[in-house]
A protein has these predicted regions:
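Bacterial N-terminal signal peptides
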Residues: 1-8
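N-terminal "domain-start" segment that seeds a small globular fold
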Residues: 13-37, 57
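Alpha/beta-hydrolase fold active-site loops
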Residues: 41-44, 74
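Short pre-active-site segment immediately N-terminal to redox-active cysteine/selenocysteine motifs
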Residues: 42, 48-52, 80-83, 148
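Structural microenvironment flanking redox-active thiols in thiol-disulfide oxidoreductases
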Residues: 55-120
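Thiol-/selenol-based redox modules, centered on thioredoxin-like
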Residues: 124, 128-174
Length: 174
């Protein structure tokens, strides 16, 4: 009886401060608010990104994923972070880098922290809902959220955005 209750609570889409996924907000790379209420009935792939990382080339596949599935209800949200000391210092620098080098047009947040006491509320929410596997261990960690605002799975940095594993989960969820 205890195990089913633990499983039930782990799958609730609430953080330990009572916030649901759709209560969250973040500023985009230009300073405009992204309200997660706008992501209801969408599948969201949240990826902490960085400009100076060995995985930075994944931007290309994130853009491909976005172009392939956005019309079906996928949101790719890049969250630039300097938590691992591999990001530019200014939002405009990140925006220009992504547009010039990778032709990115999926949503990017402002530069945020993704771990520790200063982690953005998105990552605090993810940790409280999915445990430590939702906390990025490195750049390009991926968190997949279903249409109900619940985390489906997380994927380590080395998991390519166009991998069969991620594609399969996205297609099942759309």
């Amino acid at each position: 009886l205890i195990l089913p209750m633990i499983f039930f609570f782990k799958n609730e889409a609430y953080s330990n401060d009572g916030k649901k996924f759709y209560d969250l907000k973040i500023n985009d790379i230009s300073g405009k608010v992204i309200d997660f209420k706008d992501y209801k009935d969408k599948v969201v792939l949240i990826v902490n990104t960085a400009s100076y990382c060995g995985f930075t080339k994944q931007y290309t596949d994130l853009q491909t994923l976005w172009e392939k599935y956005k019309s079906k209800g996928l949101i790719v949200l890049g969250t630039p972070s300097n938590s691992f000391n591999q990001e530019k210092k200014e939002n405009k620098e990140v925006k220009d880098f992504c547009e010039f080098n990778f032709n990115i047009n999926f949503p990017l947040s402002e530069i945020i922290d993704v771990k520790g006491k200063n982690a953005h509320q998105i990552y605090k929410w993810a940790k409280s809902n999915f445990g430590n596997s939702a906390v990025p261990k490195w750049n390009f960690h991926k968190i997949l959220v279903n249409k109900n605002g619940q985390i489906i799975d997380t994927f380590a940095s080395f998991t390519n955005p166009m991998s069969n594993k991620i594609i399969r989960e996205i297609e099942k969820s759309l």
